[in-house]
């Protein structure tokens, strides 16, 4: 080989060839990725501008390189033969290698003509990578839950003033709604609230950190948003489930949040709140309950954007067992008013429903809210919750709302109830006149359906706009009566205990218990319809001591005493014995609250 050939086309070592080859591949891949991203519309204007500048730079470098090579050949051509005779070929080769190494490998950039066209397979991979990058960038817009971990003096004051107990004390309360680390699309909906309620402030940090929670708080404390905000936020970060439908049911794995409630009214109310909140991120909630046909509910479940289900245990289990409700991908489970559901005998249904969902090891987060913390609720929590944080607002014993003024009237004759009822209606409306802008709402409770019908007739005859809510009414009639009461078309509503718990009716100023309920728990929940969301209220209770009332007198007085209410002297004639709940196997127990000495055991010889 001549010296000219050696100079014109020097041989490169294997390492240098490999390095140049890798550099070219890297540049080509980088350029192709940027171009593909720009074509797909994923790249920003800055990336597109960078691609244009890079192309311009590549063309300029190519021209400079060619010009430099031409100049170098012209300069070296006269001395080629001399250099070949004076120096051995190996040294010349080495010298040329050294010259070529002066140009860094990293400057070897491919031109547009050198870039090979991407194959279909490469284009597919590139599109997939671009989509993943876009998803990552959109997910980055959702702030990760970063809740405070250190208790400050302000946190401790908040817990003490609201009588809150955290077991264990892992997460300080979140005192400002604006500090919520949630999807930015959800924040405007919450900005209309001034500050979180105590149960919300303590629940949100733990639930946003994906911990299981047991919340014990009075009715009307904002529990729906306490579990709803973290649940909807979690679903907004999960990808929607895609797939083919099974018959007339929904796409398998489509339902990701399930809320169980004890009554149709409470389920409907929670559904309305979650629907309004979920709309901000395109999530739809469906409410399922008995008393109406299943076909309409099954059609709603099959809609593409349905990812939240709120239902009563009976209908939920029915649809799950029939295969029309797939719960295999539920990642957020809520048991609302758990003690009420257990009291109503839904424990077996709840256990069977939970069996349709994934376990906590598969990532299911479980939330339980209750007004009390009895043994039955503790047992259920220990079975289905994973190391839960327990939040107690107030006492875990049965207690009434201290913001509600309690008035107890002991009546010798039950027939006096109608007269006293109309008296309190007239007195309350005189102080709080009804108007369209500020409607006055009065809730009257009866024990039985027939009594509710009679009271509705009595109140209407007295000249008041009144509606009713009881079990003999159709579901449509119940919805209409409830809506008329909420909007102020009817300012008096007569109800049985079917509406005593969980209903969020705004601004109920007065509750009248015409007949005392069968349990003190129901009494507390009846009264809880007023004095909600931090407001004050008033409850009037007629007590005759007949039938079941006498056995509940002791517990009733204990509840009144705990909230500092005045107990009429006429109550002294009733026994102070507190009857404990009846156990299925061991019957009822009694606790004597008097200071009388305990009986002495007598032994016979």
Swiss-Prot record:
It catalyses: ATP + H2O = ADP + phosphate + H(+). GO terms for biological process: endonucleolytic cleavage in ITS1 upstream of 5.8S rRNA from tricistronic rRNA transcript (SSU-rRNA, 5.8S rRNA, LSU-rRNA); rRNA processing. Residues 204-391 form the Helicase ATP-binding domain. ATP binds at residues 217-224. The keyword Hydrolase applies. GO terms for molecular function: ATP binding; ATP hydrolysis activity; mRNA binding; RNA helicase activity. Residues 104-114 have a biased composition (Polar residues). It comes from the Eukaryota. Its EC number is 3.6.4.13. It is an enzyme of class 3 (hydrolase). Residues 54-66 have a biased composition (Basic residues). Pfam families: DEAD, Helicase_C. Residues 424-575 form the Helicase C-terminal domain. A motif (Q motif) lies at residues 175-201. Keywords: ATP-binding, Helicase, Hydrolase, Nucleotide-binding, Nucleus, Ribosome biogenesis, RNA-binding, rRNA processing. Gene3D superfamilies: P-loop containing nucleotide triphosphate hydrolases (3.40.50.300). Residues 1-124 are annotated as: Disordered. Belongs to the DEAD box helicase family. DDX5/DBP2 subfamily. ATP-dependent RNA helicase required for 60S ribosomal subunit synthesis. Involved in efficient pre-rRNA processing, predominantly at site A3, which is necessary for the normal formation of 25S and 5.8S rRNAs. This is ATP-dependent RNA helicase DBP3. It comes from Cryptococcus neoformans var. neoformans serotype D (strain JEC21 / ATCC MYA-565) (Filobasidiella neoformans). The lineage of its organism: Eukaryota, Fungi, Dikarya, Basidiomycota, Agaricomycotina.
């Amino acid at each position: 080989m001549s010296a000219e050939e050696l100079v014109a086309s020097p041989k490169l070592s294997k390492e240098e060839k490999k390095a140049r080859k890798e550099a070219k591949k890297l540049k080509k891949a980088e350029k192709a990725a940027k171009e593909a991203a720009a074509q797909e519309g994923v790249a920003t204007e800055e990336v597109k501008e960078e691609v244009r500048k890079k192309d311009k730079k590549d063309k300029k470098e190519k021209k400079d390189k060619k010009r430099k090579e031409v100049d170098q050949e012209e300069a070296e051509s006269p001395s080629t033969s001399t250099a070949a005779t004076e120096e051995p070929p190996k040294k010349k080769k080495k010298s040329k290698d050294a010259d070529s190494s002066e140009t860094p490998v990293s400057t070897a950039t491919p031109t547009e003509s050198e870039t090979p066209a991407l194959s279909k397979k490469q284009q597919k991979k590139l599109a997939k990578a671009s989509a993943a990058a876009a998803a990552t960038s959109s997910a980055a817009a959702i702030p990760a839950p970063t809740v405070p971990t250190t208790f400050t003096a302000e946190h401790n004051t908040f817990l003490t003033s609201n009588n809150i107990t955290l077991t264990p004390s892992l997460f300080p309360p979140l005192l400002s709604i604006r500090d919520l680390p949630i999807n930015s699309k959800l924040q405007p909906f919450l900005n209309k609230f001034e500050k979180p309620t105590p149960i919300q402030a303590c629940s949100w940090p733990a639930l946003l950190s994906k911990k299981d929670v047991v919340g014990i708080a009075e009715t009307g404390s904002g529990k729906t948003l306490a579990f709803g905000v973290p649940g909807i936020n979690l679903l907004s970060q999960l990808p929607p489930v895609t797939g083919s439908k099974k018959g007339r049911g929904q796409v398998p794995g489509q339902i990701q949040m399930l809320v169980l409630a004890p009554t149709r009214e409470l389920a409907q109310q929670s559904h309305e709140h979650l629907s309004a909140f979920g709309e901000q991120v395109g999530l739809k909630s469906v409410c399922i309950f008995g008393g109406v046909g299943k076909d309409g509910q099954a059609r709603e479940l099959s809609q593409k954007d349905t990812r939240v289900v709120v239902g009563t245990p009976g209908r939920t289990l029915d649809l799950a067992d029939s295969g029309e409700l797939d719960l295999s991908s539920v990642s957020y489970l809520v048991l609302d008013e758990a003690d009420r559901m257990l009291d109503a005998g839904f424990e077996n249904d709840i256990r069977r429903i939970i069996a349709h969902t994934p376990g906590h090891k598969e990532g299911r987060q479980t939330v339980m809210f209750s007004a009390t913390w009895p043994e039955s609720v503790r047992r259920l929590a220990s079975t289905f919750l994973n190391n839960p944080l327990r939040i107690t607002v107030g006492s875990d014993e049965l207690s009434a709302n201290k913001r509600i003024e309690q008035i107890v009237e002991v009546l010798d004759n039950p027939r006096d109830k109608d007269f006293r009822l109309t008296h309190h209606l007239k007195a309350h409306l005189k102080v709080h006149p009804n108007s369209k802008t500020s409607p006055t709402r009065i809730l009257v409770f009866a024990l039985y359906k027939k009594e509710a019908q009679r009271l509705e007739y009595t109140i209407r005859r007295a000249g008041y706009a009144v509606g009713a809510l009881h079990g003999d009414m159709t579901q449509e009639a119940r919805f209409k009566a409830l809506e008329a009461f909420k909007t102020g078309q009817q300012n008096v509503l007569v109800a049985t205990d079917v509406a005593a718990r969980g209903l969020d009716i705004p601004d109920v100023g007065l509750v009248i218990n015409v007949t005392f309920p069968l349990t003190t728990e129901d009494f507390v929940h009846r009264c809880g319809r007023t004095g909600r969301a931090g407001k004050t209220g008033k409850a009037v209770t007629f007590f005759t001591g007949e039938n079941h009332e006498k056995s509940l007198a002791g517990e009733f007085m204990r509840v009144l005493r705990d909230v500092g209410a005045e107990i009429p002297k006429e109550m002294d004639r009733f026994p102070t014995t507190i009857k404990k709940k009846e156990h299925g196997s061991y019957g009822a127990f009694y606790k004597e609250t008097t200071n009388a000495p305990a009986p002495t055991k007598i032994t016979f010889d």
